[in-house]
């Protein structure tokens, strides 16, 4: 009995175990399938970008809807910066995740959307990576300043890109490769509303057709960039806007800062009124962006995609309005130009959280790739910020050793490009512990050989004193008489096919052509097949020789006659010494002895263009010069100097011609009676024109042989110069200052309310020497900005004590700290990839606000500085 009960118990137990095991396996299989499905549903990504939106001047204070959605519903990054305060370079960094020195877009003009950018960096934007992994990518709005709409950038399935720079009306967009012009109708053409409608319609359509495909959209607004045209319903808001009046407002001049700050004085009353109106109009344009964010949020909520969508909101750089006396603009390394708004809202983001770590525009691309589940490419300089957004997960309550988040505390701010030659020279100076430049100049000027005004034999340099009392060293210019003597004394020798040493000049030889050879030459010249040697003047400027090779023999075009006033055909004789030249002329002085040179046959290319007496442009657009220029450094230097002098002379001539042309335009006579026959329509006039045409200058005749490609290039360059000239003329002479970037503002600039009716004025916003590289550091103990300018000027601001960068305190910083800052700056200037461009924070002493110091782990490699 016991045995039967025991057997029954075992049977029931085995049945229960089998049932439990099968249910467990089924549960595991189901859980794995669900996790796999969730893994396949990747989140949507929406990047909202504004143009020129600041943080320091209070632009976010009026955007209540955006702050409610993004700040209260997501994470706020209170230390968000851009690595360059320029539109096109910053946007290029956002797309590629690279510093400016790695994508080579330094300004809004140079290389912006150029063929080099299109071939090298555009195929490696985050859009390309996402598109290749199944994301439906779409772009709406402003792309790059110089984008011309002729192509669709790679990686974008839907493309609605603005052609050229920001506008709200009267613009052109490229819709999937087709250009579409818009006018001045608010209901149909207002740019902010247009791209909002386009993006919402695309999202709805895409989810309806491809419900399981994730979407990545960029909505790139033109606001609050100029011309600051607001929607009509917002044109009366904020009449007393004053958020832009910060402690640095109209704080000028600043003699302790770099050159443009020293040059800029306090604003005039008309400038101050302009800043007030400008701030008001900028805030009005942002109201349409605020409405756009609300519409986007509501659309996502209606479609049930809000909890599966990451929304990122930021700007390409900041802005200043009146700060340090600068009426408006960007491009400065100070916080008002490099701080930007930065918010992220998404599935793993805690609402209302604040992130104190530094985030940059170069972090956008790696972050977007990380959201999509992709690794960061090694050539990207930024890092994903998702690790800063991880929620605190419950773990072992007995575990006390939690890893702290290690993040950068320093980054590079750069603007402009240094010439390589100058950069290397400065690099050598900085690393040699030499005296400052002004002290070295002072020592040199104490030497007797530099104190005379280029009067000593062989003197190459002289010291002078400028108007401010500074000593300068200038190179002595050789007088024209010395140059003429030097040219005449240069001997003409055979380039030789000698077997001894082709680089050696062995002097004169006794070689002379035989009588038979000279007879063969004369017969060749009388031959009708030699008529291609048309009579013409080979040169009109002083030179030495020009070589012609015929039947294995080398002939020289004798150009010594160039100094004569009366031009005549030049003889070409076989190469020999001067005495044999004279004998040959006496013996073989027959008329047939001279061979007339034709410039087109000198180098064997009948359609080549003679640019100088030694260089030609061949039909295949390549340049070919005499071998001497490629073999002799002296000849190369002389010819380059000659070309530079010719360019300078032609530029002066062009300037004079433009002045005469302007004079003629101003003194244009009254219109004549066109029914009468003009002088040049008469027979005499026609003959005169034909006569002039048949006696063209040799250079002009050769210029007619330029191919159509070169002519098109010149025509485009001429038109570009004319456009620049018209802009300068529109500004006026008083607003076109050398070395400065200036603008004029008048009553016609703003075409929408509120209008400007106080007349025109001129203001300068930047300078050509405003090139710099800066370190910006933010951590628990330090908050500073250190800058090196291309002029050699240094700036240092401690934001703990001077949050508005009012005073440059570089003179109070210890030399050892400056050396370390310079070394760290040089490392970041050449970094490549996120491993080099995001160094671990250096160990800083826990100093007080009076200052701290770096660990002295580096040598003093740099000692030449100027503050």
UniProtKB/Swiss-Prot annotation:
Pfam family, one: Sulfatase
Keywords: Calcium, Endoplasmic reticulum, Glycoprotein, Golgi apparatus, Hydrolase, Metal-binding, Signal
Top-rank taxon: Eukaryota
Biased composition (Basic and acidic residues): 498-513
Location(s) in or outside the cell: Endoplasmic reticulum; Golgi apparatus, Golgi stack; Cell surface
Tissue localization of expression: Expressed in the ventral spinal cord and paraxial mesoderm as well as in the floor plate.
Top class in the EC scheme: hydrolase
Leader sequence residues: 1-22
Region: Disordered, residue numbers: 494-522, 842-867
GO CC, any one term: extracellular space
Active site: 87
A single MF term (Gene Ontology): arylsulfatase activity
Enzyme Commission number(s) of this protein: 3.1.6.-
Glycosylation sites per record: 64, 111, 131, 148, 170, 197, 240, 620, 769, 779
SUPFAM superfamilies in the cross-refs: Alkaline phosphatase-like
Cofactor note: Binds 1 Ca(2+) ion per subunit.
PTM entry text: The conversion to 3-oxoalanine (also known as C-formylglycine, FGly), of a serine or cysteine residue in prokaryotes and of a cysteine residue in eukaryotes, is critical for catalytic activity.
Function: Regulates Wnt signaling through desulfation of cell surface heparan sulfate proteoglycans.
Name recorded for this polypeptide: Extracellular sulfatase Sulf-1
Lineage, broadest ranks: Eukaryota, Metazoa, Chordata, Craniata, Vertebrata
Gene name as annotated: SULF1
């Amino acid at each position: 009995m016991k045995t039967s009960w025991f057997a029954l118990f075992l049977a029931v137990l085995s049945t229960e175990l089998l049932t439990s095991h099968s249910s467990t396996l089924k549960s595991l299989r189901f859980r794995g399938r669900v996790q796999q499905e969730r893994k396949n549903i990747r989140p949507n990504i929406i990047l909202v970008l504004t143009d020129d939106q600041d943080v320091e001047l209070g632009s976010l204070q009026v955007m209540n809807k955006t702050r409610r959605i993004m700040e209260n519903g997501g994470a706020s990054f209170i230390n968000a910066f851009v690595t360059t305060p320029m539109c096109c370079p910053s946007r290029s960094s956002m797309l590629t995740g690279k510093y400016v020195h790695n994508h080579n877009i330094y300004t809004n003009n140079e290389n912006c959307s150029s063929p080099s950018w299109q071939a090298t960096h555009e195929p490696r934007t985050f859009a390309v990576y996402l598109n290749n992994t199944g994301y439906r990518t779409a772009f709406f709005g402003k792309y790059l300043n110089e984008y011309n709409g002729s192509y669709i950038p790679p990686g974008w399935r839907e493309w609605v890109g603005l052609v050229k720079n920001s506008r709200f009306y009267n613009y052109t967009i490229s819709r999937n490769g087709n250009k579409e012009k818009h006018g001045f109708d608010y209901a149909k053409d207002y740019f902010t509303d247009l791209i909002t409608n386009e993006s919402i319609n695309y999202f709805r359509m895409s989810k309806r057709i491809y419900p399981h495909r994730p979407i990545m959209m960029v909505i790139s607004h033109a606001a609050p960039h100029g011309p600051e045209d607001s929607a009509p319903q917002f044109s009366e808001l904020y009449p007393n806007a004053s958020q832009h009046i910060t402690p640095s407002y109209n704080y000028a001049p600043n003699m302790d800062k770099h050159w443009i700050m020293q040059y800029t004085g306090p604003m005039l009353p008309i400038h101050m009124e302009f800043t007030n109106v400008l701030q008001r109009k900028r805030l009005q344009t942002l109201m349409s962006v605020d409405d756009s964010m609300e519409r986007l949020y509501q659309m996502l909520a209606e479609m049930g995609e809000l909890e599966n969508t990451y929304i990122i909101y930021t700007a390409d750089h900041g802005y200043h309005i009146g700060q340090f006396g600068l009426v408006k603009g960007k491009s400065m390394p100070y916080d008002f130009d490099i701080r930007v708004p930065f918010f992220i809202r998404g599935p793993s983001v805690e609402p209302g959280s604040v992130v104190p770590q530094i985030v940059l525009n170069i972090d956008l691309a790696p972050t977007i790739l990380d959201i999509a589940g992709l690794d960061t490419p090694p050539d990207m300089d930024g890092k994903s910020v998702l690790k800063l957004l991880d929620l605190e997960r419950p773990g072992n309550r007995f575990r006390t050793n939690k890893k702290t988040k290690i993040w950068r505390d320093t980054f590079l701010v750069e603007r402009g490009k240094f010439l390589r030659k100058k950069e290397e020279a400065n690099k050598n100076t900085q690393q040699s512990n030499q005296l400052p430049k002004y002290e070295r100049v002072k020592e040199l000027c104490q030497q007797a050989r530099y104190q005379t005004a280029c009067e000593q034999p062989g003197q190459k340099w002289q010291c002078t004193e400028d108007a401010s009392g500074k000593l300068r060293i200038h190179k002595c210019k050789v007088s024209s008489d010395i140059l003429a003597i030097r040219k005449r004394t240069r001997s003409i020798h055979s380039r030789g096919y000698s077997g001894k040493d082709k680089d050696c000049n062995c002097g004169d030889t006794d070689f002379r052509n035989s009588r038979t050879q000279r007879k063969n030459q004369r017969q060749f010249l009388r031959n009708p097949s030699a008529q291609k040697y048309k009579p013409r003047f080979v040169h009109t400027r002083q030179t030495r020789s020009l070589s012609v090779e015929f039947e294995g023999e080398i002939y020289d075009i004798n150009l010594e006659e160039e100094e004569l006033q009366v031009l005549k055909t030049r003889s070409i004789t076989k190469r020999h010494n001067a005495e044999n030249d004279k004998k040959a002329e006496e013996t073989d002085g027959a008329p047939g002895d001279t061979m007339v040179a034709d410039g087109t046959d000198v180098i064997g290319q009948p359609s080549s263009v003679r640019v100088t007496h030694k260089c030609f442009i061949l039909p295949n657009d390549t340049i070919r010069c005499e071998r001497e220029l490629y073999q002799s450094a002296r000849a190369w230097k002389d010819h380059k100097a000659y070309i530079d002098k010719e360019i300078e002379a032609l530029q002066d001539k062009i300037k004079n011609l433009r002045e005469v042309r302007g004079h003629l335009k101003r003194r244009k006579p009254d219109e004549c009676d066109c029914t009468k026959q003009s002088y040049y329509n008469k027979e005499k006039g026609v003959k005169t024109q034909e006569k002039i045409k048949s006696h063209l200058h040799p250079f002009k005749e050769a210029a007619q042989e330029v191919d159509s490609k070169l002519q098109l290039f010149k025509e485009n360059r001429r038109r570009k110069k004319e456009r620049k000239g018209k802009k300068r003329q529109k500004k006026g002479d008083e607003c076109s200052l050398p070395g400065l970037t200036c603008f004029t503002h008048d009553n016609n600039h703003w075409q929408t309310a509120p209008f400007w009716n106080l007349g025109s004025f001129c203001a300068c916003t930047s300078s050509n020497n405003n090139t710099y590289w800066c370190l910006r550091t933010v951590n628990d103990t330090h908050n500073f900005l250190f800058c090196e300018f291309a002029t050699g000027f240094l700036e240092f601001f401690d934001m703990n004590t001077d949050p508005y960068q009012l005073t440059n305190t570089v003179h109070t910083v210890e030399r050892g700290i400056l050396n370390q800052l310079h070394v760290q700056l040089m490392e970041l200037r050449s970094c490549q990839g996120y491993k080099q461009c995001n160094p671990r924070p250096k160990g800083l002493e826990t100093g007080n606000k009076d200052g701290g110091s770096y660990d002295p782990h580096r040598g003093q490699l740099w000692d030449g500085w100027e503050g």
